[in-house]
């Protein structure tokens, strides 16, 4: 019979679960939002409206901000869009929405920022793609113009290299050097190196033009998960600039969610990333705010931040009663997310609340007891009653067709007692039905 392993101090170290220490980067202020330097990982999103349409863009930015986006990027691709930016900012300010706007520039950013100073002033950050800021002799001049304008207005920049618009001159140079090497690398490795060099060389040039490091954020987006991970690992190892994470062209639906979550989850676990965006192709008529929800859920699931109360729900099986459990779990989750914009102002700390919605007696009561407030529905063949647990103790049993509404009312009462002004922790419940 084998002797049991001796537990040592070294072996106990593996008992500590959690991500690697955050990669140390330089803090950048984007409007009123801190990025990098140990600040909480920031969620950002991007509109898909025509920026020249002020009303629709304001409406979508407002929806994204309400969903929890802490920065919103808008396309600035032509004169009409640049002219609209200050009006968009003005309308958002009138609504009390202070979310920073990021201008996304390609090809003619130097021209638009020069000719529309109100646009340059209204934006909180400029995004520059070094692969299309200009070509051949014009590249350095046009890049310099944008950096000089950013310096003039005191704006940070994100220098974002992208797999689909890579600097072809740099790539050709690296490919030629690789071909002449005694130990050539494969083509994808050379492309990854071109991505990293493009971002780093551009950042160094920006600093030469007078831009301080605390106004530079880097990104290097790829559409393949493993390539993205490798690129960002290399970028982090070679610099301390603040880093924006995102998987480009992730796709729509579950494919896009899974691909982005897989790539970003690995990098975040390794301590890499200061701000993230989940780039999803929206379904026709779909909700643009889904990308914000996924980003928040990724960060919350991994323990980096808390945004909304956590709703634990079992997956359901043959023991659960038809669709009743599924409908209740969805109803409670939607209810909490819909109320959060109000709750986070009225009830500071409410995002740490844990709620359980369970489907039968196997794990239901136990899981509900571990939550702040939980409900365990009757499973198939069980008594038609749903016990509610508050802070680990049975509080009440709900019955009848109004279980969902009754449980929501109990959740609101609990939140008001625990997180309301002058609140104290809810009193222990001594009686149960």
From Swiss-Prot:
Q: What reaction is this protein's catalytic activity?
A: (2E)-4-hydroxy-3-methylbut-2-enyl diphosphate + oxidized [flavodoxin] + H2O + 2 H(+) = 2-C-methyl-D-erythritol 2,4-cyclic diphosphate + reduced [flavodoxin]
- Cofactor(s), by name: [4Fe-4S] cluster
EC no. given is 1.17.7.3
| Binding-site residues for [4Fe-4S] cluster, renumbered to this chain | 314, 317, 360, 367
| Region listing for Disordered, in residue ranges | 1-23
Highest taxon above the source species: Bacteria
Q: Which molecular function terms from Gene Ontology are attached?
A: 4 iron, 4 sulfur cluster binding; 4-hydroxy-3-methylbut-2-en-1-yl diphosphate synthase activity (ferredoxin); 4-hydroxy-3-methylbut-2-enyl-diphosphate synthase activity (flavodoxin); iron ion binding
The metabolic or biological pathway listed in the UniProt record of this protein is: Isoprenoid biosynthesis; isopentenyl diphosphate biosynthesis via DXP pathway; isopentenyl diphosphate from 1-deoxy-D-xylulose 5-phosphate: step 5/6
GO biological process annotations for this chain's record?
isopentenyl diphosphate biosynthetic process, methylerythritol 4-phosphate pathway; terpenoid biosynthetic process
Q: Which InterPro entries match?
A: Dihydropteroate_synth-like_sf, IspG_bac, IspG_bac-typ, NO2/SO3_Rdtase_4Fe4S_sf
Biased region (Polar residues) positions are: 1-13
Q: How is the cofactor bound?
A: Binds 1 [4Fe-4S] cluster.
Keyword annotations for this protein, in alphabetical order, are: 4Fe-4S, Iron, Iron-sulfur, Isoprene biosynthesis, Metal-binding, Oxidoreductase
> One Pfam family name from the record?
GcpE
Q: Which family does it belong to?
A: Belongs to the IspG family.
Q: What does this protein do?
A: Converts 2C-methyl-D-erythritol 2,4-cyclodiphosphate (ME-2,4cPP) into 1-hydroxy-2-methyl-2-(E)-butenyl 4-diphosphate.
Q: Which NCBIfam families match?
A: ispG_gcpE (TIGR00612), PRK00366.1 (NF001540)
Q: List the HAMAP family hit by this protein, alphabetically.
A: IspG (MF_00159)
State what protein this is by name: 4-hydroxy-3-methylbut-2-en-1-yl diphosphate synthase (flavodoxin)
């Amino acid at each position: 019979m084998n002797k049991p392993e001796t537990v040592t101090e070294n072996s106990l170290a593996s008992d500590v679960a959690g991500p690697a220490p955050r990669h140390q980067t330089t803090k950048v202020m984007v409007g009123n939002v801190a990025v990098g330097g140990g600040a909480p990982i920031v969620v950002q999103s991007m509109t898909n409206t025509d920026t020249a349409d002020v009303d629709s863009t304001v409406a979508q930015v407002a929806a994204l901000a309400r969903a929890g986006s802490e920065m919103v990027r808008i396309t600035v691709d032509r004169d009409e869009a640049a002219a609209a930016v200050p009006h968009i900012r003005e309308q958002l300010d009138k609504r009390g929405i202070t979310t920073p706007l990021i201008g996304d520039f390609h090809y003619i950013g130097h021209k638009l920022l020069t000719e529309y100073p109100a646009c340059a002033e209204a934006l909180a950050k400029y995004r520059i793609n070094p692969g299309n800021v200009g070509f051949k002799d014009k590249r350095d001049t046009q890049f310099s113009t944008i950096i000089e304008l950013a310096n003039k207005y005191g704006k940070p920049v994100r220098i974002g290299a992208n797999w689909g618009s890579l600097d072809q001159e740099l790539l050709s140079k690296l490919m030629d050097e690789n071909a002449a090497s005694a130990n050539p690398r494969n083509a994808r490795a050379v492309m990854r190196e071109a991505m990293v060099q493009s971002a780093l060389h551009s950042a160094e040039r920006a600093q030469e033009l007078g831009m301080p490091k605390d106004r530079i954020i880097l990104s290097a987006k790829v559409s393949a998960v493993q390539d993205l991970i490798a690129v960002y690992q290399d970028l982090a190892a070679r610099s301390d600039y603040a880093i924006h994470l995102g998987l480009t062209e992730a796709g729509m639906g579950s494919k896009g969610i899974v691909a982005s979550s897989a790539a970003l989850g690995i990098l975040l676990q390794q301590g890499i990333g200061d701000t993230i965006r989940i780039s999803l192709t929206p379904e026709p008529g779909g909700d643009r705010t889904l990308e914000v929800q996924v980003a928040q859920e990724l960060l919350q699931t991994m323990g980096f931040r808390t945004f909304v109360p956590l709703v634990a729900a079992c997956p359901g099986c043959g023991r659960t009663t038809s669709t009743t459990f599924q409908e209740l779990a969805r109803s409670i989750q939607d209810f909490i997310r819909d109320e959060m914009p109000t709750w986070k102002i009225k009830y500071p700390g409410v995002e740490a609340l844990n709620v359980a919605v369970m489907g039968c007696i196997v794990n239901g009561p136990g899981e509900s007891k571990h939550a702040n407030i939980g409900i365990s529905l009757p499973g198939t063949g069980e008594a038609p009653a749903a016990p509610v647990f508050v802070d680990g103790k049975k509080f009440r049993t709900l019955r009848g067709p109004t279980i969902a509404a009754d449980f929501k009312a109990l959740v609101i009462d609990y939140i008001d007692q625990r997180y309301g002004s002058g609140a104290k922790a809810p009193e222990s419940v001594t009686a149960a039905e």
